[in-house]
Amino acid sequence: MAACGSAQGASQAIFRLAAQEGWNLLSSAYGIREAVHNVPALGDAAIAEWKRIESKLIRIRDELVFDWPVVSVPAKDRPILFSAAASADVLLTLDKKDFGSLMVHGFYGLPILKPGHFLERERHAGRLQEKTI
């Protein structure tokens, strides 16, 4: 959703760089419904941008249950977390309020990062082909 609100931010850069970097951008149906619900609050330009970038997302299955204890994430965010844990290498979010405690240690091996921190990590590891964002 953040990619819809700013043409210059890290979220937008991730969409721009995904193909050349070999990144698959994943979202569950639940995540897409959340974006469709929330993007209009960002205005008409954000709605148009959502229509453009939504087609770049690979749909993954919603995961609604998890086999291990989960206590620090609100129920409304668990489908996002569980789906990412089942299918992704990293969960990117700006939702520090609900995912902040997991941004330090991750979730059962799944790193949870802000988009800008993800780009910094990739650049520092020498995996980011483009040096300027």
Predicted regions span which residues?
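Short secondary-structure boundary segments
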Residues: 29-30, 94-96
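Acidic, PIN/NYN-like endoribonuclease modules and their adjacent C-terminal/linker elements
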Residues: 70-74, 97-133
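Short, well-structured N-terminal submotif of metal-dependent ribonuclease cores
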Residues: 1-27
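Short, flexible loop segments at the rims of nucleotide/cofactor-binding pockets, characterized by
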Residues: 2-5, 66-72
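Acidic, metal-associated active-site segment
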Residues: 74-90
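PIN-domain endoribonuclease scaffold, especially VapC-family toxins
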Residues: 19-69
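Short, structured coil segments at secondary-structure junctions
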Residues: 21, 53, 87, 106-108
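Short hydrophobic alpha-helical runs that function as membrane-insertion/retention elements
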Residues: 24, 91-93
